[in-house]
Amino acid sequence: MNYQKKKGNLIHKTAVINWRNLKIGINNKIGPYVVIGGEAQHPRKKSDGKIYIGDNNVFNEYCNVHLPTSRKKKTFIGNSNYIMNSTTIDHDCYIEDNVILSSNVVLGGNVYIMKGAQLGIRTIVHQNQVIGSYSMIGMGTLITKKKMIEPGYIFYGKPVKKIKSNNIALKRKKISEQKLKNELI
């Protein structure tokens, strides 16, 4: 099967992992050619610090997770996230729990993704963005500087536009829009 058990995780033999700079939970699946702990892709800052990965995450083939840019920062991936193939999580990103990143998603540095968000195929998120909880981003969307992705809404396009409330996800999770608005305060 080409997978091996290591530190309570299932890791493909072709995965490249910087164990020295990684703190990882259990029951994660790390697929073929995944790179965790590559240098931060920043022209003026040195890679330093740690990557923190919780429990029960799936990293499909060719994903990249980069080191943070200083010891005071971290690249963080919570619990039960599903990261599809060829996704890039750049330096200093913070991903909460139950997030889905579809194939070929690219997160610039310092992106914060709140719980339950779903990003469609080939979504590109510019650095320093916040993606609200239980938001859904349509495939091929480009999120540039200074755009607030509000919790609980569906967004799509180039440039990105708010389409409507993500009612289905909110009903499934029994979450009111008012509760999500309070997250922004």
What would you call each of these model-derived segments?
Residues 14-15, 160:
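Long alpha-helical scaffolds
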Residues 12-14, 25, 31:
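Conserved CoA-thioester-binding segment of acyl-CoA-metabolizing enzymes
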Residues 1, 5-7, 29-53, 58-64, ...:
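Glycine-rich hexapeptide-repeat left-handed beta-helix
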Residues 90:
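Short metal-binding segments enriched for Cys and/or His
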